UniProtKB/Swiss-Prot annotation:
Protein name: Putative hydroxypyruvate isomerase
The protein's Enzyme Commission number: 5.3.1.22
Residues at the active site: 150, 249
Reaction(s) catalysed by this chain's protein: 3-hydroxypyruvate = 2-hydroxy-3-oxopropanoate
Encoding gene, per UniProt annotation: HYI
């Protein structure tokens, strides 16, 4: 079984450094082979591509733009009346992905509108999401890109987020029926919403295109105190044949590099994947 491949989420790691290029360089110096970032749009794609190239890293995941965060938006994919803005954001994400050689884009679903009842608007929001996802699948297919759907927990992190369980996301993916749309499995969110990680990983891994990890409930390093047994979960992913990247999307409890001792231990035990795997 091949060792897992890890990517540094630069929206979370190396907060002690200012600017994405500096964080890219730090990730390379720390042994990562890949990075991911939610929203790279404050930097030019040329600057990011140059930093990644100099650090010998690949960029493997970005998100679609969040929309108007001052108005509380956190993605637009399922938000009624924001279809045009979603498509504009998708075009921007595709431009960045192409310039950066990034193969995956997280298509953010967005939040239930302020003051609306989740149950009352669920059908309308799902219809909007399906419409936008079908459009996105076509756009992404033309560029050989993959779109990802990520359930985000509504118990702690974002009570208004529309897409909050792997079951809901898998059902939507089945309705869209496009092979270049896949599931993004953030183990932090899945544990909070449903638990049953062994069963859910085995059930949904065939449609998973990217994995992210953080400890529960504090969202710290996998080695920090919490509910999750990451040596077991990493072994499970290996045993199930997962070949994608595992994104380190957590809040370092102190210095980022010192907090990567868990990853250095994994590499010492399992080795780095061969380049190009």
């Amino acid at each position: 079984m091949a060792p897992l491949r890890f990517s540094a989420n630069l929206s979370w790691l190396f907060p002690e450094l200012s600017g994405l290029p500096a964080r890219v360089r730090a990730a390379g110096s720390s042994g990562f082979e890949a990075v991911e970032v939610a929203w790279p749009y404050a930097e030019t794609p040329e600057a990011l591509a140059r930093a990644a190239r100099e650090a010998g890293l690949r960029l493997v995941l970005i998100n679609t733009p969040p929309g108007d965060q001052e108005k509380g938006e956190m993605g637009l994919g399922a938000v009624p009346g924001r279809q045009a803005a979603f498509r504009e954001g998708l075009e921007q994400a595709v431009r960045y992905a192409k310039a950066l050689g990034c193969p995956r884009i997280h298509l953010m679903a967005g939040r239930v509108p302020q003051g609306a009842d989740r149950i009352a608007v669920k059908a309308e929001m799902e219809a909007v999401f399906l419409e936008n996802l079908r459009h996105a699948a076509g756009v992404l297919a033309q560029e050989d890109l993959v779109g990802l759907l990520e359930p985000i927990n509504t118990r702690i992190t974002d009570p208004q987020y529309f897409l909050d369980t792997p079951q809901q996301a898998a059902a939507i993916l089945q309705k869209v029926g496009r092979p270049n749309l896949q599931l993004q499995m953030d183990i932090f969110h899945w544990q909070i919403m449903d638990g049953n990680l062994t069963g859910n990983i085995r059930e949904f891994l065939p449609i998973v295109g990217h994995v992210q990890v953080a400890q529960v409930p504090g969202r710290g390093e996998p080695s920090s105190p919490g509910e999750l047994n990451f040596p077991y979960l990493f072994q499970l992913l290996e045993d199930e044949g997962y070949k994608g990247f595992v994104g380190c999307e957590y809040q370092p409890r102190g210095d980022t590099v010192e907090g990567l001792s868990w990853l250095r231990s994994y590499w010492d035990r399992r080795g780095h994947p061969e380049a190009g795997q």
